[in-house]
Regions:
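Catalytic PLP-binding core of fold-type I/II PLP enzymes
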Residues: 1-26, 41
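Active-site C-terminal subdomain of aminotransferase-like
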Residues: 13, 28-87
Length: 87
């Protein structure tokens, strides 16, 4: 898929929400895990749920971007959220 993303100059998002925090350690233990991260040409973003195996609070997640230009489009402010301001 990474080769297609490069060929057609489109973004490739990798959903690592389940296992994203475990897979790098499994690779270090010599499990045969295919490359899935920014080492794959064409991968432009990844998501990880920190509340699953990252031991963070329920509902927290992380989005990682390969390029700053992609990240700049992500920011928003929503003041009517019941938990307060979210930015």
């Amino acid at each position: 898929m990474g080769m297609l993303a490069v060929k057609y100059q489109i973004g490739l998002h990798v959903d690592c929400c389940l296992g994203g925090f475990v897979l790098p350690f499994a690779k270090k233990l010599n499990y045969k895990i295919p490359d899935f991260d920014f080492s794959v040409p064409g991968v432009s973003s990844m998501s990880l749920d920190t509340h699953k195996y990252g031991y963070a609070l329920k509902g927290t997640s992380v989005v990682l971007y390969a390029f700053k230009e992609l990240r700049q489009s992500q920011y928003f402010c929503y003041a009517d959220w019941t938990g307060g301001e979210c930015a």
